[in-house]
């Protein structure tokens, strides 16, 4: 069961990030869950801050809520059509920030999920830096990386892995070469603005 849930999470992340995706506009017609102040609750674990200048909430879904899996994403730049590895035309942005929250029954399961995500990152990315960051009172392991898969339209990124009680949390900012912002600063701003 634990392995199956980890596989589901890995497949969800791969579908979102590793295939060079984005999502079609018509797939985003569902009302995203956003508060009046621009903050976005993601599961029961956290409320993501209103996005910094230049970023827009693209999606906020409870993709597998029955399994405690929640997903949100923010984008920067204008959408550009892109044909992904599956032959589907999707929108691609200068940068896309993805948040995945997996709410578990135990802290051990949350720790296992975080560990699994970190292992996947080591397998799929060339990691140039790893550090511990405390933001918004929460400790994260932060990596900076480039993508190993040259067919991925995103060139580099930064990710943060953390655990809050029984919840596993992963933030990942994927950037094209054209992105001129400071990826680590943007991610840190999001992390500092979270409430748990």
PLM regions: where:
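Secretory pathway targeting signatures of secreted, lumenal, and periplasmic proteins
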Residues: 51-104
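Short, hydrophobic/aromatic-rich segments at coil-to-beta transitions
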Residues: 37, 66-73, 136-144
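C-terminal motif of bacterial Sec signal peptides marking the signal peptidase cleavage site
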Residues: 16-20
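Signature of long, low-cysteine stretches enriched in small and polar/charged residues
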Residues: 115-159
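Bacterial signal peptide processing site
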Residues: 22-24
């Amino acid at each position: 069961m634990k392995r199956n849930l980890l596989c589901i999470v890995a497949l969800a992340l791969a579908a979102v990030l590793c295939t060079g995706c984005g999502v079609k506009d018509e797939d985003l017609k569902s009302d995203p869950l956003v508060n009046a102040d621009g903050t976005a609750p993601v599961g029961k674990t956290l409320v993501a801050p209103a996005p910094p200048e230049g970023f827009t909430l693209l999606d906020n879904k409870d993709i597998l809520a029955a399994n405690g899996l929640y997903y949100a994403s923010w984008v920067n730049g204008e959408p550009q059509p892109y044909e992904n590895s599956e032959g589907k035309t999707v929108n691609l942005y200068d940068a896309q920030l993805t948040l995945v929250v997996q709410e578990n029954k135990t802290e051990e399961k949350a720790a296992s999920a975080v560990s699994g995500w970190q292992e996947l990152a080591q397998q799929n990315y060339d990691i140039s830096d790893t550090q511990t960051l405390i933001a918004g009172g929460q400790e994260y392991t932060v990596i900076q990386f480039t993508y190993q898969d040259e067919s991925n339209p995103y060139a580099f990124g930064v990710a943060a892995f953390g655990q809050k009680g029984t919840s596993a949390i992963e933030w990942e900012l994927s950037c094209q070469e054209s992105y001129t912002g400071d990826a680590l600063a943007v991610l840190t701003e999001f992390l500092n603005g979270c409430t748990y």
